[in-house]
Design a protein with these regions (language model features):
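Conserved eukaryotic protein kinase-like
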Residues: 1-338
Length: 338
């Protein structure tokens, strides 16, 4: 009996020490080197959110709350991660690595973090106009065509920074309207880097078992093929159709031929009936066709047929010609727009 108690006591001490080491590990493994972020205690963020009362939204790994940081009275969005032991810890580390050392006007800015015991929180700039999803699908005032084109360019330029302009190439892996936030000027910014993959300088592809959101993930995810930056291009293409048409990528309440947005867009493009996509909205035909062509190139099943995001930006800006795209699901065409 005494021996059993001694073993139990020793085991408890070892478990305690392991957990303490694990909690400190983020401080000691080089994760925060060269990252100029403010470290907050849980008590500070609890006070900033008034006990986490004002909920802004929920995601797969946690909940976002509105808060006010006393220093400077800055309004912020605070993401409190849940299921920290597994997925939450991974999301925390991914977001810290991905945007802790990046800055771009089309990326949501990360101000600080909390790594206090088992608590994992991230402090972001507050985006007063919510998500692009709410703006497109729930707002009484729908975006104008000018706003749609500006939003599309905002997001494309943010992805361009991640893929080609920041120190470490980043594949976001979860581009969708819910992860695009709008500031007070309706400027769109990319958020939620919990699934992001960082590539080494000599690396162009990666393997990962983690997938983004159904409907936005590129076909190569389903075949367990290498993931490249072209996966983000595919997701952007699906979202671009949602921006153009102001509807979800799948809507079971619509007629059968319109249920899957990407298929319907291609059918309308082939039939020369693009006006069906925007209904009563007044849009210049050439501008609408340009956006549709960009989207159709982005969603090609074959990754090599998709343009790099830099080319996507140029096409959206109207500075390069866009050839007629093949059927997105056709592997017969040898056309490339790279």
């Amino acid at each position: 009996m005494v021996f059993a108690l001694i073993v139990l006591a020793i085991t408890s001490i070892l478990i305690y020490r392991y957990r303490a080491w694990k909690n400190k590990n983020i401080e000691n493994d080089g994760l925060l080197e060269d990252v100029t972020l403010r470290s907050y205690t849980y008590a500070e963020l609890d006070k900033a959110t008034n006990g986490f009362l004002d909920e802004l939204g929920r995601g797969a790994f946690g909940t976002v709350f509105k808060g006010v940081i006393p220093n400077g009275r800055r309004v912020v969005a605070i993401k409190r991660l849940e299921n920290v032991v597994a997925e939450g810890e991974r999301e925390f580390r991914n977001e810290m690595k991905a945007i802790g050392r990046t800055y771009h006007k089309n990326l949501v800015k990360l101000y600080g973090y909390c790594h206090d015991g088992n608590n994992r929180l991230l402090v972001y700039e507050y985006m007063s106009n919510g998500s692009l999803a709410k703006f497109l699908f729930e707002s009484e005032r729908k975006p104008s065509w000018e706003e749609k084109t500006r939003i599309a360019l905002n997001v494309a330029r943010g992805i361009l920074y991640l893929h080609e302009e920041c120190e470490t190439q980043i594949i976001h892996c979860d581009i969708k309207p819910e992860n695009i936030l709008m500031d007070e000027h309706k400027c769109a910014k990319i958020a939620d880097f919990g699934l992001a993959k960082l590539l080494m300088p000599n690396q162009t592809r990666t393997y990962t078992g983690i997938r983004g959101t159904r409907g936005y993930v590129a076909p190569e995810w389903h075949g367990n093929l290498p993931i490249t930056a072209k996966a983000d291009v595919y997701s952007f293409g699906i979202m671009l159709f949602e921006i153009i048409c102001g509807r979800r990528h799948v809507d079971m309440d619509l007629p059968e031929d319109e249920v899957v947005l990407a298929n319907w867009v291609y059918d309308c493009f082939q039939a020369g009936e693009l006006d069906k996509l925007v209904k009563d909205e007044e849009v210049e035909r050439n501008k609408l066709e340009r956006m549709v062509r960009v989207g159709l190139w982005c969603i090609q099943d074959e990754p090599s047929l998709r343009p790099p995001i830099k080319k996507v930006v140029l096409m959206l800006e109207g500075t390069v010609e866009i050839p007629a795209p093949p059927s997105p699901t056709s592997f017969l065409s040898s056309m490339e727009v790279n």
